[in-house]
Amino acid sequence: MAAAYLDPNLNHTPSSSTKTHLGTGMERSPGAMERVLKVFHYFESSSEPTTWASIIRHGDATDVRGIIQKIVDSHKVKHVACYGFRLSHLRSEEVHWLHVDMGVSSVREKYELAHPPEEWKYELRIRYLPKGFLNQFTEDKPTLNFFYQQVKSDYMQEIADQVDQEIALKLGCLEIRRSYWEMRGNALEKKSNYEVLEKDVGLKRFFPKSLLDSVKAKTLRKLIQQTFRQFANLNREESILKFFEILSPVYRFDKECFKCALGSSWIISVELAIGPEEGISYLTDKGCNPTHLADFNQVQTIQYSNSEDKDRKGMLQLKIAGAPEPLTVTAPSLTIAENMADLIDGYCRLVNGATQSFIIRPQKEGERALPSIPKLANSEKQGMRTHAVSVSETDDYAEIIDEEDTYTMPSTRDYEIQRERIELGRCIGEGQFGDVHQGVYLSPENPALAVAIKTCKNCTSDSVREKFLQEALTMRQFDHPHIVKLIGVITENPVWIIMELCTLGELRSFLQVRKYSLDLASLILYAYQLSTALAYLESKRFVHRDIAARNVLVSSNDCVKLGDFGLSRYMEDSTYYKASKGKLPIKWMAPESINFRRFTSASDVWMFGVCMWEILMHGVKPFQGVKNNDVIGRIENGERLPMPPNCPPTLYSLMTKCWAYDPSRRPRFTELKAQLSTILEEEKVQQEERMRMESRRQATVSWDSGGSDEAPPKPSRPGYPSPRSSEGFYPSPQHMVQTNHYQVSGYPGSHGIPAMAGSIYQGQASLLDQTELWNHRPQEMSMWQPSVEDSAALDLRGMGQVLPPHLMEERLIRQQQEMEEDQRWLEKEERFLKPDVRLSRGSIDREDGSFQGPTGNQHIYQPVGKPDPAAPPKKPPRPGAPGHLSNLSSISSPADSYNEGVKLQPQEISPPPTANLDRSNDKVYENVTGLVKAVIEMSSKIQPAPPEEYVPMVKEVGLALRTLLATVDETIPALPASTHREIEMAQKLLNSDLGELISKMKLAQQYVMTSLQQEYKKQMLTAAHALAVDAKNLLDVIDQARLKMLGQTRPH
């Protein structure tokens, strides 16, 4: 049998200086005749099924067995004896099954004389099936998949248009289930998913033309959706076995039948059936039971020849053990007799575990006189190669290239580097195939160029070597300032890829280490640079397929480069690339990539959106704590990654566009590049403005002290301007107008004087509005926000009082210490003080509207504007002053506190009455207080509590509310009838609030350990807060009714 190997240069012409190496390490002799054979097969790849093929190089002595052996070896097949080799003429029904001992060159010369080579199709097929073949094939996945694809192809070509509509629907839906086994059972309910299947993949791949033509599109869609749901829980293997189960009653794919006659003349016309269960049997009429002739283990010899009559029919003779005379079968032609002989011989070899043929015949052209040479061990092969051999012997090889991943070796002239010029340094990382080292390239142009060297641990295997070098093939086609450059390759073992070195390492690690030193402008700059690289790839029709922060390298503090092109693919003439196998980054992938393994520039856009999110989150991975299998379900439920803290809403809006479920609605990289450029420029302008404001504030604080030794006064509480801090908290009215579109509630920044000037993107819902500030303290505003002329005069006054240097230094140090103390004091006070702006139901809804719950199918975190200033908030009380029930000061606003881990500070409440009434025996008042205390207790325990403890806590609140409402029902009859309606409305509102709390609790339990868990906890607190506020409102309504009643009974 011919030795076979893989040569990556097969489909490309190497340069004259390039050595062509065999996969086994043996060099080809010059002048050796070689021919190329294209063999079609059913090993699944990313291309269309009709194009699945391998390109084979063969020499004069290569036999059919050698070609079969190499193809199946490359796919790690166990049941090699089941495979046969078929030659078909495309313009007629002429079919020849080629025996494994036939020489390929002789076969080609024989048949290509009759018809041109392009009219012949060489095909690898499974022909010989063992008993219980499905059970055996389940342990040999490549063979099971091969046989399934073969049977499915035969079914679609031969009988699909004749089968019942229900069977055709089931078989088609099983193929959809098998092909896209990671797709959820209800995925086809989504219009965009069905359209991908219908328009991009094509329904004709799954269903016969007769079905598609006879059923209306809308009806067909419903039928497919209903049928697909029946198989929603099947995996790939179960789908295949179910397919065979449904198909076998209408199509016997496990046997072959031949019309012939028993005996040497046409006496008994029969249909000979040959298969694993029947052995050799015949049927005289359709529908009758087969008559058994012989088992394969009884066959001793097989002979065939032309008959002696003028019709030249084919004669087949089988010598059966125990039979008095040979079994003679007359076939319509010699070709059919040969095909029958090959089939029976294959079954005999399979059953007996033999390699020797059972066919006895005279030597003919195209056949070998001796059986194939058995396969030798590697050591024996190497030993043989040391001997002098003739040219014809060195040509005895078969060479295979899978068209799926054809690789072109970079030419020696341009990219081959001598290993002596590389100094290998320390290991700086680990790649998919091996370690990555730092090193030095000693080139004539640059004597000591720092480089990164990718090594391959197991590149002795041709397939691993090919896949490893695929990245170099891809990278050499790119030249962009934000894409890592290929410097060269070393193709001799050990194989190395040499690339430019990015000294600061992976972007994800860089972001984590520099989390507190990188400003927002730098993060947006990185995203913009990546968008330029990806726009470049898009223009060259490449899909990257693995865009993530871990695959971006940092060249300098202001330059990042896209790397790791191991998964990149050129899309050729199609608009998408389909991956057939391999590990893929599920949590970064677009839904169509997860469901259909479909990769396009639009799917790269989705991944880029996730990568931008990683950058803004300083290296946090997406969907932390979620299993890969659960990601697609969450995406299809409308879940999206939440808005990162301090992220400009315009940038988050751009991310959400990248995450549109429908690929056609996502922007292109050219659009992303332009929009990111605009966002980057806006951020730079805002950054410069904040720096000017900070400088002006520091100068004002420093100069205003003049020659006085008095320290600056302590700033007022959060939400109340002081003379010193007003300029830091509030930009000028012109600046306020410019920056309103960057204000987002729910993301408070750090507090205190040093951070005040930098609060452009921070939540400002608790701060007084600029116009209200003027209304509150016009004198202070006029005093501490002078005009430009006044500012200049003030500056001159401050500069005029010059202090000795040592006194100035001491004063500045003291002021700095006091400012730090003020900062700590502010942070401490803010935990207990929240302005009243959060107490109205309307402001709660507006502030926490950054996530409005499930709306439609999209759970997207929506940025909101500042609160409506139509009703100015009231001034909160001083710290320690007697509280009022309406303040509910012990309940922190969920929108702010949840960003600090929901650290709520429950306090004892002793609320004074809202009206001058006797509370000694006021059950309504007591129960309202009890309800508020239950809410406070729940709020304090919700953060560390596991999901199973949510129900008891909410139940306590519900019991307190039920007691309150029962008490109100007892109180209503004693109150004026005119007030009953208002009281009942307040009761209904409380019931609605409890329902909202229970709804949010269920969502928090459902999305435990996901990115939405914290958000739904926050919404639970918001609902509980609303319940407490409305309970107090109910008390106010009842108090008003009591006062009205007292006024009616009072004597006039």
Swiss-Prot record:
Gene3D superfamilies in alphabetical order: 1.20.80.10, Nucleotidyltransferases domain 2, Phosphatidylinositol 3-kinase Catalytic Subunit, Chain A, domain 1, Phosphorylase Kinase, domain 1, Pleckstrin-homology domain (PH domain)/Phosphotyrosine-binding domain (PTB), Single helix bin, Transferase(Phosphotransferase) domain 1
Polar residues bias: start-end ranges: 10-21, 886-896
Region (Disordered): 1-27, 685-734, 837-921
Protein kinase domain segment(s): 431-680
Entry's EC annotation: 2.7.10.2
Keyword Nucleus (UniProt): yes
Name this polypeptide is given: Focal adhesion kinase 1
UniProt source species: Mus musculus
Lineage, opening ranks: Eukaryota, Metazoa, Chordata, Craniata, Vertebrata
